[in-house]
């Protein structure tokens, strides 16, 4: 027997089931800071200067969750700094500035020697012959600062949706950032400056690389990037001769994402892209000494591009040589599970990256070309409970930035969640799928859709005509309604279970139906050969449900595999019964039926 309830049940999603950003705030981020420290960490002076140069009046400040404790004081300091700058003014309209006068047919429209109309006509005013009133100069408008504290997506991306709610002119993004290009608003990036134990970092470096001629690239998280030049100078003074450093640039698709490699003099070094024809420095001969824990997406992207990667942990004393081979193996297993998926869901996890719409279009076309069905859904923060509502989906692909597209803790998800790069490998045939170790997480690597050329369209029509002629010849030879293409297709097996999969390409099976219709139409012609009257067996796999004439694998799943499809749908399954009059009356006595016996209550 179930225990007695002492409180009302909790119907909301537990907090531990939410998908949260993996960065844990360190002690130096949560302790109290002075005003001077906040000015330095959040770069108040530089931010105010850029806002003043841009002439922006409505400023949105986007803080990650662990920095919200500093938001009120940052707003006060920024407003005080902005107050010392000249206030922006709203420019007067072009009509007011250009209104002049020549001649007016209606003298009654004048007022004390001035034009009372002030109407813009071809840039000369109304033509009354009187001087138009001088435009009134607008008063300076005070700047408004807003805190954007509820980011629906990953904290590394600029939340343009929240900024548009306050009609912001510019967004100031604080903390770590993926530096993905935005589509609408200008952005001021403030990575914030964190304290680094320089002596401990130098000791770890010398212990890991005792050889003074070791080829190493110094790299740091964006919050520690300010310490890289000084560390490089001190290490070179200690005798290291083959050291390089990195600087932050806005280039997620770089050989090192959002970084350029520079020498001791700050000159950029050309990097080879790994191909045989490319020239420049080969990063596979260099190790990377990374300050602070990088995101997992960066680790996977770098593991095949550099010799090895050493991570210096700033939040603890543990530092080690990192290997991503096991994690890459798990990612490869995830994408293999989608090779036989018939229905793929597209999760839109960003609305701010500039090319997300074209990337969605490309992914849809890739899925359709493979004979599979796709459904697009816009979500906020991902969690297993959201995706579990769609049992029809065999797997998911995330459309987001190169950091947030990777779902690290995906053990709780019922279906695999992969990146667009992994989807491209999953849709490839077994002969074409080659795993080289390269990996990418975002939509930057999605190939744009290829526009159809007129010549290609014409050749495609010729191929369709030839296919119809061939189909007519097959029908004349007695093949009936069977689709030879589907019969000749090789069987597909699930790589995990080894079972035969018959529904991995549902849209390709649906596309074979119009061919059969064309065959029937061609047989109605007078000169067409007579159709065979013999009965043929049609495969049930080709009988898919359709919605408004469009084949829908989701509707097919609802029809064949759902045990409950809504209220009132079980009326046909239960046998109907004749309505009979029941017992009636009052508590003193009841009557069974219209003329039934009366039962008295004792």
UniProtKB/Swiss-Prot annotation:
Annotated gene: dph-2
Quaternary assembly: Component of the 2-(3-amino-3-carboxypropyl)histidine synthase complex composed of dph-1, dph-2, dph-3 and a NADH-dependent reductase, predominantly cbr-1.
Natural source organism: Neurospora crassa (strain ATCC 24698 / 74-OR23-1A / CBS 708.71 / DSM 1257 / FGSC 987)
Name of the protein in question: 2-(3-amino-3-carboxypropyl)histidine synthase subunit 2
Cofactor info, note text: Binds 1 [4Fe-4S] cluster per subunit. The cluster facilitates the reduction of the catalytic iron-sulfur cluster in the dph-1 subunit.
Biased composition (Gly residues): 584-594
Transport is among the record's keywords: no
Main location: cytoplasm
Chain positions covered by the region annotation Disordered: 445-537, 576-602
């Amino acid at each position: 027997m179930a225990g007695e309830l002492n409180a009302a049940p909790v119907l909301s999603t537990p907090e531990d089931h939410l998908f949260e950003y993996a960065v844990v705030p360190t002690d130096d981020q949560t302790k109290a800071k002075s005003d001077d420290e906040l000015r330095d960490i959040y770069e108040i002076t530089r931010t105010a200067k850029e806002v003043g140069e841009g002439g922006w009046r409505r400023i949105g400040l986007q803080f990650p969750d662990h920095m919200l404790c500093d938001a009120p004081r940052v707003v006060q300091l920024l407003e005080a700094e902005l107050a010392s700058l000249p206030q922006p003014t709203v420019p007067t309209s072009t009509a007011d500035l250009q209104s002049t006068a020549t001649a007016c047919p209606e003298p009654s429209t004048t007022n004390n020697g001035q034009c009372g109309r002030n109407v813009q006509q071809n840039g000369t005013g109304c033509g009354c012959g009187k001087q138009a009133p001088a435009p009134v100069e607008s008063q300076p408008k005070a700047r408004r600062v807003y805190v954007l504290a509820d980011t629906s997506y990953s904290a590394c991306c600029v939340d343009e949706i929240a900024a548009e709610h306050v009609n912001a002119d510019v967004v100031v993004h604080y903390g770590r950032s993926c530096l993905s290009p935005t589509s609408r608003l200008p952005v001021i990036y403030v990575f914030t400056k964190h304290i680094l134990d320089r002596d401990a970092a130098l000791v770890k470096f010398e212990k890991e690389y005792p050889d003074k001629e070791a080829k190493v690239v110094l790299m740091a998280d964006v919050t520690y990037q300010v310490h890289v030049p000084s560390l490089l100078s001190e290490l070179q003074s200690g005798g290291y001769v083959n050291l390089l450093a990195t600087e932050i640039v806005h280039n997620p698709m770089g050989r090192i994402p959002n970084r350029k490699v520079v020498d001791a003099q700050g000159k950029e070094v050309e990097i080879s892209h790994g191909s045989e024809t490319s020239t420049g420095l080969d990063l596979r001969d260099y190790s990377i000494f990374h300050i602070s824990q990088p995101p997992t997406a960066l680790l996977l992207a770098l593991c095949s591009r550099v010799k090895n990667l050493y991570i210096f942990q700033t939040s603890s004393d543990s530092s080690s040589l990192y290997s991503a081979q096991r994690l890459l193996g798990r990612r490869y297993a995830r994408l293999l599970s989608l090779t036989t998926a018939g229905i793929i869901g597209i999760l839109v996890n960003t609305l701010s990256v500039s090319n997300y719409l074209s990337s969605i279009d490309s992914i849809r076309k890739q899925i359709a070309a493979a004979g599979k069905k796709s459904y697009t859904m816009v979500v906020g923060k991902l969690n297993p409970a959201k995706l579990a509502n769609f049992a029809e989906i065999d797997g998911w692909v995330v459309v987001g930035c190169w950091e947030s597209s990777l779902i690290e803790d995906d053990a709780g998800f019922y279906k695999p969640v992969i990146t667009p790069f992994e989807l491209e490998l999953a849709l490839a045939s077994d002969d074409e799928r080659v795993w080289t170790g390269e990996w990418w997480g975002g939509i930057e690597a999605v190939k744009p859709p290829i526009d159809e050329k007129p010549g290609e369209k014409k050749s495609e029509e010729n191929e369709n005509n030839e296919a119809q002629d061939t189909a007519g010849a097959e029908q004349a030879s007695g093949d009936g309604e069977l689709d030879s293409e589907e019969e000749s297709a090789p069987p597909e097996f699930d790589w995990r279970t080894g079972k035969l999969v018959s529904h991995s390409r549902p849209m390709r099976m649906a596309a074979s139906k119009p061919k059969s219709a064309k065959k029937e139409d061609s047989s109605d012609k007078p000169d067409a050969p007579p159709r065979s009257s013999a009965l043929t067996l049609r495969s049930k796999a080709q009988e898919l449900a359709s919605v408004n004439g469009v084949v829908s694998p989701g509707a097919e799943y609802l029809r064949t595999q759902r045990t409950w499809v809504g209220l009132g749908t079980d009326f046909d399954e239960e046998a109907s019964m004749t309505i009979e009059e029941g017992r009636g009356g009052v508590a003193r006595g009841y009557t069974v039926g219209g003329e039934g016996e009366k039962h008295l209550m004792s």
